[in-house]
Amino acid sequence: MNQPILSYAIQQRRYQAAVPFISRTVLDIGCGQANLPDFVPPLEMYVGLDVHVGCLQLAQKRYPQHQFYQLDLDRQFFPSELLDQRFQTITMMAILEHLAYPLHSVWQAAELLAPSGYLIVTTPTSLSHRVHQIGAYLGLFYREAVDEHKTVLDRDSLSWLFIAVGLEVVVYKKFQFGCNQLIVGKRRN
């Protein structure tokens, strides 16, 4: 599949925004082809979840030492194999806007955080919605991604999601000229 010119650059910037909070054990929700390990030092444990089987097959070829699971976040619970594990870092990079029930997935993620672990979320801002539509039309972004957006979350709604599942918001910031936002929550001990 040909990748639109700006999609990879934007993905790189998302990862760079998250790197300061990434620890040695990572659950990457919406991992795609598992590009996150390219941006961080070697990890003790990396587990990727994604809905797209083709992406997971490529990820498994690139990283045979890591675990990958197919999962539709709107229709399924996390794999039972993960329920006894705890992760220092859980990422949801550009995922929540694709979900009909983001609270369900944030709650499941929070349950798998280790004490003092971080949940890192990036999502487009309302400004980026229109920019994304124009960019997709021009072939700069994936057209499918725009069509799949089910919700637009702002700072208040993201903060509410984190607080509702018992996380303390430690960082919120916009980046990429206000088109994306990063929120980091820490599990309360």
Q: Model segments located where?
A:
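Conserved class I S-adenosyl-L-methionine
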Residues: 120-141
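A short glycine-rich, Lys/Arg-flanked "PGG" loop and its adjoining helix->strand segment in the class I
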Residues: 104-115
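Feature marks short, surface-exposed loop/turn motifs that line or immediately flank catalytic pockets
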Residues: 77, 116, 127-129
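Histidine-centered divalent metal-coordination motifs
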Residues: 98
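Conserved N-terminal segment of class I S-adenosyl-L-methionine
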Residues: 1-85, 89, 103-106, 146, ...
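A short beta-strand submotif of the Rossmann-like class I SAM-dependent methyltransferase core
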Residues: 89-95
